[in-house]
Amino acid sequence: MITENQLYINDLKSVMNEPLPWDKIDGSSVLITGANGLIASFFVDCLMYRNKTLNGNIEVFALCRNKEKSENRFKSYLDNNSFNLIIQDVCEPLNLNVKFDYIIHAASNAHPMAFAAYPVETMRANILGSINLLEYAKKYNPEKFLFVSSTEIYGRNNSGLNNGLKEEDCGYIDCANIRSAYPESKRASETLRVSYGKQYGINTVSVRPGYIYGPTIQDDNTRADAQFIKKAVDGENIVMKSAGNQLRSYCYVSDMVSAMLYVMLLGENGGAYNIANKNCAVTIREFAETAADIAGVKVVFENPGDIEKSGYSLIGNGVLDAGKLESLGWSAKVNLREGLKRTISIR
């Protein structure tokens, strides 16, 4: 079980060591949607670890769609009174009567094959999911509503070629391409949350993660970096299906979740914040080569299939400027090589 792995526990400890106003979250109730995912599952583990080791007394509500998968992932918490598992599709209105202090909306299709094969479901989860969560927030007025957006909302954009994309940069997205189902619906969801905030007085923020990786990544994730990690863990050669020259801002999951906490507890109402490690802006190929070197395997090349190609991101530059986030006091702690070593070791 991942929560018993000492390296993973060290990652949880590192988040707890952040100089945050923990009194704001201790004793609170927190709803996390998409709780099975790479980012949200680590967030759940952080809160439960705080309860166990620091008497956080946080009531955690993990909303997931897949009952079997979620019960397996969180089986060590199922008998814990501070943990509540909610099985529901976010496309349906929440039939709950709980006043959450914090709502973290992280439910979304999050990998290319899903975008290509299920563009409608991708859009529904983002847009209807956001509406349903925001309607719930309108009723109960939480301390903060945090929406997990994406670097892809910047579209094709050359604004940040030198120093990274800032929160006000906005590039072109081809709305007639089905691959745009993901970034367009993330954009719409960001506009929804600021609209609800303005019209109904809800305190909202959003985070725009770069390319997040870590031991909580799932085997069925078809994103290139996820597949590189899977191959490395299995001791197999890493297969690249493009030249891999696109630049990406990578960030280890513990740094991602600590950043979310900074934004949730200290972020400006209505604000959006990039999350990226400024020392981990590398090409996809460099990411693959680093993982291969750690695992002692090779990088090989193979032609992609048609469905795979249709799911590829159209973004060339995916480097983010996280200066706004850093102004809150956050800094990334884990470099790329160390993050990949931890990921491969823990998995």
Residue locations for each model-derived region?
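C-terminal substrate-binding subdomain of Rossmann-fold SDR/epimerase-dehydratase oxidoreductases
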Residues: M1-L7, N84, A232-R347
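N-terminal Rossmann/SDR dinucleotide-binding element
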Residues: M1-Y102
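NAD(P)H-binding glycine-rich loop region in Rossmannoid oxidoreductase-like domains
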Residues: I87-A125
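Active-site segment of SDR-like NAD(P)-dependent oxidoreductases
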Residues: N109-M113, T151-N158, R179, G210-T216
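Conserved Rossmann-fold NAD(P)-dependent oxidoreductase catalytic core, especially the SDR/UDP-sugar
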Residues: I131-S180
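Conserved beta-loop-beta element that borders a ligand/cofactor-binding pocket
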Residues: S150, E190-P215, A226
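Active-site helix of classical SDR
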Residues: A181, S185
